[in-house]
A protein has these predicted regions:
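Catalytic cores and adjacent flexible loops of soluble metabolic enzymes
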Residues: 1-253
Length: 253
């Protein structure tokens, strides 16, 4: 499991988490047998090291240096950025980081031949594919997963959004297919329809979710009441039309 609350959930509150909330979110992750913790696009100063692996996301349009306190770099790219992304991954790997490729809008990706012919697949800990606008059905998860398998990737991971309330079903499908890792956030915090709630995923997998329940009670209920996220008409339309949340107001489904 990868807890991406601070990074993806941060779109909701402009990454304005208090230091104590950051530290206690990490502590809940550590105490719940969650393997990866995505600290954001930059490493918060209040995080030094952890017994879980600390991840920083880098966008392909903004390749930058990464804190040595991080263990892993997850490089996010749209389909047209794949060449730059692969080059950057090799550089981050040479710097000693674990590296993940994160394919955004994965259903729109077509250049599978480029991935198939990439000779450095073994540098990746895993390749992620994302349901960026919360439009996938389980059949879409299976289709893309198998395409990536056909390209020669062994460790395949999945990032869900919950616009159509299918983040859980889609993630279960990825797990059944043998996913290396799946993403989730505290209380489903995330833009649009939100993300898969990590506390529900832990329950499904038979892991201890009690630390996250305490965390929700102490911090995330207040964040939810202040900012709001989850199922809404706009989230529904975004998922049905498979479009970015910023374009929903211009769309009639």
């Amino acid at each position: 499991i990868l807890d991406c609350t601070l990074r993806d959930g941060g779109h909701i509150n402009n990454w304005n988490f208090s230091d104590i909330c950051v530290r206690e979110t990490l502590r809940a992750c550590e105490n719940s047998a969650v393997e990866y913790f995505e600290a954001g696009y930059n490493m918060p100063q209040c995080i030094k090291k952890s017994n879980v692996k600390l991840v920083i996301m880098v966008d392909a349009k903004n390749i930058c240096s990464v804190s040595k306190n991080a263990d892993c770099v997850r490089l996010a790219c749209y389909p047209h950025q794949i060449s730059e992304a692969l080059d950057a991954l090799e550089e981050y790997k040479n710097q000693g980081f674990e590296v993940f490729l994160h394919l955004m809008t994965a259903d729109k990706f077509e250049d599978y031949e480029r991935l198939k012919n990439w000779k450095n697949k073994d540098i990746l800990t895993s390749i992620y594919f994302a349901d960026s606008f919360g439009a996938f059905m389980p059949v879409d998860v299976e289709r893309i997963y198998k395409k990536l398998q056909d390209c020669g990737f062994e460790n395949i991971s999945f990032h869900a959004h919950n616009n159509l309330q299918l983040a859980f079903a889609n993630t279960i499908k990825a797990i059944e297919l043998g996913a290396y890792s799946v993403d989730a956030t505290v209380f489903g915090m995330g833009r649009g329809g939100g993300n898969l709630p990590i506390e529900l995923l832990l329950k499904y997998l038979g892991k201890d979710y009690s630390h996250y329940l305490e965390l929700i009670r102490k911090y995330y209920i207040d964040l939810y009441n202040k900012y709001g996220w989850g199922y809404s008409y706009d989230a529904l339309v975004g998922g049905l039309a498979n479009i970015h949340p910023s374009k929903v107001s211009q769309t009639i489904v």
